[in-house]
C-alpha cells in the first residue's frame, strides 16, 4: 500500500510539472505575440496589455475601413475608365519599347487632354542612356498624341538597356498624370 501511494504521488507530481511547463510555454508564447503586436501598433512607447489590445483593435478596424474605401475607389475608377473609353474621351498612355541589336524604338500614345510630355525630355532620356537619336516624331491626330523615337547605341558593344529607358519614360509620363495601377 505504501508503494502504491509513492507511485500515485509520482504521477501527480509529473502531471503538475507538465501543467507548469505547458503554462510556462503558453505565457512565453503570449508574451512573444504581445511584443509583436506592440511593435506593429505603437513602436514609440510601451503600453499595458489592455491598452495595447484596444489600440490594435481600433487600428485593425481603421485598416479594414481603408481597404473597403480603396476597393470602392478602384471600382468607381474602373467603371469611369471603361465609360470614358467607350465615349472615346479618355485614353490611358500606351508605351511600347522594342530593341533589336543596337537599335531601340519607342512608341508612346497619349490622350490629347492630358498634359503634354515634351519631346525633348524623351530625347534627353535616350541620350543620357548612351543612345544617339536617329529619328524623333510627334504627331497630333484627333484626340491623341503619338511620340515615336528611334535611336541607336553610341557604342554598339555596350548597347542600350530598354528596361531602364522604359522606367525613366514611365516616370515622366506618370509625373504628369495621375494613374493608379
Swiss-Prot record:
Keywords: DNA-binding, Nucleus, Transcription, Transcription regulation. CDD domains: bHLH_AtORG2_like. Residues 14-63 form the bHLH domain. Its main location: nucleus. Residues 1-22 are annotated as: Disordered. One of its GO terms (cellular component) is cytoplasm. PROSITE patterns: BHLH (PS50888). It is found in: Nucleus. One of its GO terms (molecular function) is protein dimerization activity. GO terms for biological process: regulation of DNA-templated transcription; regulation of transcription by RNA polymerase II. It holds the Pfam family HLH. InterPro entries: bHLH_dom, HLH_DNA-bd_sf, MASH1/Ascl1a-like. Belongs to the bHLH protein family. This is Transcription factor bHLH167. It comes from Arabidopsis thaliana (Mouse-ear cress). The gene is BHLH167.
Amino acid at each position: 500500500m505504501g508503494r502504491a501511494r509513492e507511485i500515485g504521488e509520482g504521477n501527480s507530481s509529473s502531471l503538475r510539472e507538465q501543467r507548469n511547463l505547458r503554462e510556462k510555454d503558453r505565457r512565453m508564447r503570449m508574451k512573444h505575440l504581445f511584443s509583436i503586436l506592440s511593435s506593429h501598433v505603437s513602436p514609440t512607447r510601451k503600453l499595458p496589455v489592455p491598452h495595447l489590445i484596444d489600440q490594435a483593435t481600433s487600428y485593425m478596424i481603421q485598416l479594414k475601413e481603408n481597404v473597403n474605401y480603396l476597393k470602392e475607389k478602384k471600382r468607381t475608377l474602373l467603371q469611369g475608365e471603361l465609360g470614358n473609353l467607350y465615349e472615346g474621351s479618355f485614353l490611358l498612355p500606351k508605351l511600347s519599347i522594342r530593341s533589336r541589336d543596337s537599335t531601340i524604338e519607342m512608341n508612346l500614345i497619349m490622350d490629347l487632354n492630358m498634359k503634354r510630355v515634351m519631346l525633348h525630355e524623351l530625347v534627353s532620356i535616350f541620350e543620357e542612356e548612351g543612345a544617339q537619336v536617329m529619328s524623333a516624331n510627334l504627331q497630333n491626330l484627333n484626340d491623341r498624341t503619338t511620340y515615336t523615337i528611334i535611336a541607336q547605341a553610341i557604342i554598339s558593344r555596350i548597347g542600350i538597356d530598354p528596361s531602364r529607358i522604359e522606367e525613366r519614360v514611365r516616370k515622366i509620363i506618370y509625373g504628369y498624370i495621375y494613374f493608379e495601377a
